[in-house]
A protein has these predicted regions:
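Hydrophobic transmembrane alpha-helices and their immediate loop junctions
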Residues: 2-297
């Protein structure tokens, strides 16, 4: 029987052909005709590469350059060693805090002629965590004073006690609220809690004063470093990342921790000088002021 003209029919089976011409009706699991070609799968976002840290060869070279530079500006192997050791302990304080707060594994980088840098694998989860990380360096860094104070007292050596004083001053200067020092990262979120513009105005003003202080006291490398940092902050449009602002209780705790850390660092610096002044506080305080070039009698 022939198919009725004008109506479609199933294709006839040809036993001599290897091709199946039978028309198959779409099943319930087939794509609709307009979606017969599946859309390409979205590209996977590549996971951020893990920071492997400073290359060992460059780390050794940077440390040697830093040690030579410190010896050149201090004229003392002991004081240069104290400053270098203090830098490592300071940065290790940041590393411990980063690892504890889920930002690790953090790495330490030595930057010749400037200092060190602790770098985590990810950003802090909140501004409060950022404050804790920034204050961990100066607070933990004071531990580096212990061996130099002990040897200085045992040998009655002014050189070793001066090394301990330098370690305390490294941590105290880092608490200046000038970008990119630790003080700006600890105090900046507190100022932002009051008003977003207050952080920018206050930190840039303090940064400018710090540059002027460096130039006026002959600390030209520090002044250049701070000047570049302040300029880069001026070019940046957004200061605070999307971590969420501090709550008022967190802002209060941040300010209290900042002031307490600064007070402990200042007391440690004066304490390291007390054996050199026979235990007299006022002469030790004057020695500290003369060191930072802001006065002293």
């Amino acid at each position: 029987m022939r198919p009725v003209a004008g109506r479609s029919s199933r294709a006839q089976f040809d036993p001599m052909s290897d091709t199946d011409h039978t028309t198959r009706r779409p099943g319930p699991w087939d794509l609709p005709p307009e979606q017969a070609t599946p859309e390409p799968a979205p590209a996977r976002k590549s996971a951020p590469l893990e920071d492997k840290g400073q290359h060992p060869a460059w780390a050794i070279a940077s440390t040697l350059l830093m040690a030579g530079f410190l010896w050149w500006i201090t004229g003392s192997v002991v004081v240069a060693g104290a400053v270098l050791f203090g830098l490592f302990v300071h940065e290790y304080g940041h590393v411990l805090a980063m690892n504890r707060l889920g930002m690790g594994p953090a790495r330490i980088y030595i930057i010749p002629f400037l200092g060190g840098l602790a770098k985590g694998q990810r950003e802090p989860k909140s501004e409060w965590h950022g404050v804790l990380v920034s204050l961990a360096g100066p607070a933990f860094g004071l531990i580096a004073m212990a061996p130099f104070v002990a040897v200085g007292l045992a040998l009655k050596s002014p050189e070793w006690l001066t090394g301990a004083f330098f370690i305390a001053m490294i941590n105290l200067v880092n608490l200046l609220p000038a970008p990119p020092l630790d003080g700006s990262k600890a105090l900046g979120p507190v100022l932002t809690r009051v008003h977003p513009r207050l952080e920018q105005v206050a930190l840039l003003a303090v940064g400018g004063l710090a540059v002027w202080w460096g130039l006026s006291t002959g600390r030209f490398i520090l002044a250049a470093f701070l000047g570049i940092a302040v300029f880069s902050h001026l070019k940046r449009g957004v200061w605070r990342t999307a971590w969420g602002r501090l709550s008022w209780p967190e802002a209060g705790r941040s300010l209290a921790l900042y002031l307490a850390t600064a007070a402990v660092c200042a007391a440690a610096a004066i304490g390291a000088l007390l054996p050199l002044t026979g235990g007299a506080v006022e002469p030790a305080f004057d020695m500290g002021l003369r060191f930072i070039g802001v006065g002293g009698r």
